[in-house]
Amino acid sequence: MDARRARQKDCRAKKNFKKFRYVKLISMETPSSSDDSCDSFASDNFANTRLQANREGCRTRSQCTRSGPLRVAMKFPPRSTRGAANKRTVPPEPPENSVTDSNSDSEDESGMNFLEKRALNIKQNKAMLAKLMSELESFPGSFPGRRSLPGPSSRPKTPRRRTFPGVACRRNPERRARPLTRSRSRVLGSLSALPTEEEEEEEEEEDKYMLVRKRKSMVGYMNEDDMPRSRRPGPMTLPHVVRPVDEITEEELENICNNSREKIYNRSLGSTCHQCRQKTIDTKTNCRNPECWGVRGQFCGPCLRNRYGEEVKDALLDPNWHCPPCRGICNCSFCRQRDGRCATGVLVYLAKYHGFGNVHAYLKSLKQEFEMQG
């Protein structure tokens, strides 16, 4: 009996082994496997086999554990009903062409309505304005300076009176005269001595030669009261001190500035040059004219040389030396403006270009040339 049973067991084992031949081999997962190595499960198609095994296991579990229907708190509608509901909620979209056509039609209609309303408003406003103007013109005293029917004026037009009674009438009233400025009033004097029309014409002809225009004669100024206001010293003018030649020291002669670069500016201890108006500590000239006043006779070395061709040392050692303003040849901007002339500016380079050593000689030659032409 025992041998028989053993044979039956061997036969059963062989049959089971034959069935096991057709089962796929599954590699076991080890902790040493990783994605970086070539022996990973992904390279052996292990993931697919594992998913299939899980699906088969799930099927068997569901078949074993399925005892009744699944109960949940809220039941979802079936797929067919949900699709129908979504289709009902979405409205049908109209074609794009119809939308654009309707928009363009509405815009054209609104534009036409706006233009019509605008034209109507303009027409109404014009009518209202014309009505108001007609009502205003109907009143007699509404526009005092304006007449409804202006008639021809019978009164002859009288010539306009001049502002200055002592001046002769102009033959050409349309031409405007030069304005009476402060500088012109100094030259011309009072209002009674204003020039006549012929003199103004001569002045206009000489305007193109403003640089060397002739100065008005000072013959009429006989006494001090008749002198212009600018020729009299003011109350704040410094007293003029005439220094004799014996008081001039060698230190002062050595302190004479020969170049503008050698100037040292000092507003508390320096002295002012009449020409350049700069306050420096170098030695200036001293006018020996007792009637001179203030700092009018003080000239620095560069200004006296470039403007008048003289030296400060010679002027200090000359007991009869008079400053250019006292001689009437000063060409600084203040003196020229007082005489009715324009300022020359930096004219020394132009004078040297034409062969003259100083500005005074160049202006004198220009004046002689224009007098010969006239």
From Swiss-Prot:
Annotated motif Nuclear localization signal, positions: 160-176
Gene Ontology biological process terms from the UniProt entry: apoptotic process; regulation of DNA-templated transcription
Disulfide partners: none
Subcellular locations according to the entry: Nucleus; Cytoplasm
Keywords, sorted A to Z: Apoptosis, Cytoplasm, Isopeptide bond, Nucleus, Phosphoprotein, Transcription, Transcription regulation, Ubl conjugation
Chief site of localization: nucleus
InterPro entries in the record: CDCA7/CDA7L, Znf-4CXXC_R1
Modified residues (Phosphoserine): S142, S190, S217
Modified-residue entries (Phosphothreonine), positions: T163, T196
Region (Interaction with MYC): 146-170
Cross-link Glycyl lysine isopeptide (Lys-Gly) (interchain with G-Cter in SUMO2): residue positions: K208
Quaternary structure and interacting proteins, as annotated: Interacts with MYC (via C-terminus), YWHAE and YWHAZ.
Record's protein name: Cell division cycle-associated protein 7
Annotated source species: Bos taurus (Bovine)
